[in-house]
Swiss-Prot record:
Organism of derivation: Macaca mulatta
Glycan attachment residues as annotated in the record: 3
Compositional bias segments (type: Basic and acidic residues): 334-344
Family from the record: Belongs to the G-protein coupled receptor 1 family.
A matching Pfam family: 7tm_1
Entry keyword Phosphoprotein: no
Residue ranges of the region described as Disordered: 323-344
Protein name, UniProt field: C-C chemokine receptor-like 2
Extracellular-side segments: 1-43, 96-104, 170-198, 260-281
Domain notes: Lacks the conserved DRYLAIV motif in the second intracellular loop that is required for signaling of functional chemokine receptors.
Keyword field: Cell membrane, Disulfide bond, G-protein coupled receptor, Glycoprotein, Membrane, Receptor, Transducer, Transmembrane, Transmembrane helix
GO molecular function: C-C chemokine binding; C-C chemokine receptor activity
InterPro entries registered for this protein in UniProt: CCR1-9-like, Chemokine_rcpt, GPCR_Rhodpsn, GPCR_Rhodpsn_7TM
Lineage, broadest ranks: Eukaryota, Metazoa, Chordata, Craniata, Vertebrata
Length: 344
């Protein structure tokens, strides 16, 4: 009788204990992204915002006032700086209280800036390849600038259309009694919607990583085949390629972490320790990726001698008479810069 009554109780106790252990294991080491986000996001994003806005506004000033917009690459570089500014404008507002409309506006600016930057990086690389392939004669000067304006408009429209799904399905995270525009958690993943979760993650991976990586790799290989007979010409493409490489290097870790986090069931990463590592890696890699907007102006300074010259002129005001240096610089740019594109 005792055995009959104790055995079920023992078995029942074991089952309860196993369930509790399972629940504890499931929740034991879940990484609290809100905690680290509250510590790092406000200070880091504010610093990146200040530095990035100042740097990119300086780039816009140099391009518009000194270098001019009579070359297609300058038009693309200007739009690239504007894309960075759109991205940067969202950073101070992450992890702060805000309603649904405010968060959706931030999401829209964030992804429009990110996608447009990807497109302009690809356009810059493609433009330099076409200039080299056709030795500067594939378009007349009169046709190049309108073509640059049209392709820039198409890139912006495409970036806006690509952002519509994120804008439509985003829901702000609920924390305590307030809504927060969450930076730490992937902002465009709607709750309990597996299809949208997979679709938007794949769209992010393809748009920001796979597509530009394919464009860059293909064009780089094609150009290297021809440049082996004239390595000196390769220096003309350092700036454009450096911008693309830095963009890919800074966004690749986040895209990989996001992909693994979204499809963790397919990679046997659903255990508690893997969830902890994935949540942590998504947040940290995203924080690193947001700093990319501050890097492009540094590349201009280190790799573009003309930009450095205009930058020194802007800060030091070396010219004695304002008109003659302007003519001299204008003639220098019209003689030197178009020659670079035609020599290639």
């Amino acid at each position: 009788m005792a055995n009959y009554t104790l055995a079920p109780e023992d078995e029942y106790d074991v089952l309860i204990e196993g369930e509790l252990e399972s629940d504890e294991a499931e929740q034991c080491d879940r990484y609290d992204t809100w905690a680290l986000s509250a510590q790092l996001v406000p200070s880091l994003c504010s610093a990146v915002f200040v530095v990035g806005v100042l740097d990119n506004l300086l780039v816009v000033l140099i391009l518009v006032k000194y270098k001019g917009l009579k070359r297609v690459e300058n038009i693309y570089l200007l739009n690239l700086a504007v894309s960075n500014l759109c991205f940067l404008l969202t950073l101070p507002f992450w992890a702060h209280a805000g309603g649904d409309p405010m968060c959706k506006i931030l999401i829209g600016l964030y992804f429009v800036g990110l996608y447009s930057e990807t497109f302009f990086n690809c356009l810059l690389t493609l433009q330099r390849y076409l200039v080299f392939l056709h030795k500067g004669n594939f378009f007349s000067v009169r046709r190049r600038v309108p073509c640059g304006i049209v392709t820039s408009a198409v890139a912006w429209v495409t970036a806006i259309l690509a952002t519509v799904p994120e804008f439509a399905v985003y829901k702000p995270q609920m924390e305590d009694p307030k809504y927060k525009c969450a930076f730490s958690r992937t902002p465009f993943l709607p709750a309990d919607e597996t299809f949208w979760k997979h679709f938007l993650t794949l769209k992010m991976n393809v748009s920001v990583l796979v597509f530009p990586l394919f464009i860059f790799t293909f064009l780089y290989v094609q150009m290297r085949k021809t440049l082996r007979f004239g390595e000196q010409r390769y220096s003309l493409f350092k700036l454009v390629f450096a911008i693309m490489v830095v963009f890919l290097l800074m966004w690749a870790p986040y895209n990989i972490a996001l992909f693994l986090s979204t499809f963790k069931e397919h990679f046997s990463l659903s255990d508690c320790k893997s969830n902890y590592n994935l949540d942590k890696s998504v947040l940290i890699t995203k924080l690193i990726a947001t700093t990319h907007c501050c890097v492009n102006p540094l590349l201009y300074v280190f790799l573009d001698g003309t930009f450095r010259k205009y930058l020194c002129r802007f800060f030091h005001r070396r010219s004695n008479t304002p008109r003659q240096p302007r003519r001299r610089f204008a003639q220098g740019t019209s003689r030197e810069e178009p020659d670079r594109s035609t020599e290639v």
